[in-house]
Amino acid sequence: MNLEVIAQLIALALIVGSGPLVIALLAARKGNL
């Protein structure tokens, strides 16, 4: 595999993994308010 392909896979993994975390943080902030 090329480094570019690996970099793209890592970027996609970070985006997919950070998605739910961001939603959870926003929900927590709204809950605290």
Curated annotation (Swiss-Prot):
Keywords: Chloroplast, Membrane, Photosynthesis, Photosystem II, Plastid, Thylakoid, Transmembrane, Transmembrane helix
Disulphide connectivity of cysteines: none
One Gene Ontology term, aspect cellular component: photosystem II
TM helices/strands, residue ranges: 5-25
Keyword Chloroplast among UniProt keywords: yes
Mode of membrane association: Single-pass membrane protein
A GO biological-process term: photosynthesis
Classification via InterPro entries: PSII_Ycf12_core-subunit
Compartments in which it is found: Plastid, Chloroplast thylakoid membrane
Major subcellular site: plastid
Subunit structure: PSII is composed of 1 copy each of membrane proteins PsbA, PsbB, PsbC, PsbD, PsbE, PsbF, PsbH, PsbI, PsbJ, PsbK, PsbL, PsbM, PsbT, PsbX, PsbY, PsbZ, Psb30/Ycf12, peripheral proteins of the oxygen-evolving complex and a large number of cofactors. It forms dimeric complexes.
Name under which the protein is recorded: Photosystem II reaction center protein Psb30
Annotated source species: Physcomitrium patens (Spreading-leaved earth moss)
Highest classification ranks of the organism: Eukaryota, Viridiplantae, Streptophyta, Embryophyta, Bryophyta
